[in-house]
Amino acid sequence: VDVCPTGSVSHSEFPPEKTHTIDYSQMPTPEQVMLLIKSRRSNRTLTSRPVPKEMLDKIVEAAHSAPTATNSQSLSFTVVTDPQKLRQVSDYTIGVFDSLAKLLLNPVVKCVVKPFMKDVYKYVPVFNRLKEEHKAGKDPILRKATALLLIHTPKSNRFGSEDANLAYQNASLMAQSLGVSQIYMGFVLTAIRQEGKDTLAKTLGIDGKIQAIMALGIPAFKYPKYTDRKEIVKNYIE
């Protein structure tokens, strides 16, 4: 249906209202796309202003348009803007890290585990710092984001993580184009994996596995410049 230039092909699975003509004259230039990519960054200085719903809808639509393995299209999206629920996400993450820190500092566990997991122990001071900042009323997890986008899949999806992170990048670039800051919630995902349960998913009414999480907010300022990344490591095999 999509490839036919004259519209002569029809299919019951793809009704006319679901197919759209591409106006290639409206495509951004390669330079514009590259500028969008290079200007995107995790701006953690956020205001208390909510992200307008129409912007959130565009961000979700961009995520939904990402490719999926075997064209499964099995991604689902949950947008959280309820301040109480956002607080619960932070509380949950801090709680998991606090329990982990206490376990790692148990004398018996420390004696057995530390020689083999030195990299893990370097995070104990980080966990404790996050806990103290959280107790002081700061928001070291969500950075005062006013919205969360959770991307989730059925647990049976073998490529759920890959699909979700492809969708995340689409959403991230759309958010950047809208002037909305976006931050990858690595701490929250780490807590989910560490706990190994569905606690947060159940709290948020999500049926499935949370694969990627984006915090969203209106930035307090925009960066006027970007800095080049490290030198590209590349190799062409010809």
Description of each model-found segment:
Residues V1-E238:
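Acidic, surface-exposed loops and disordered segments
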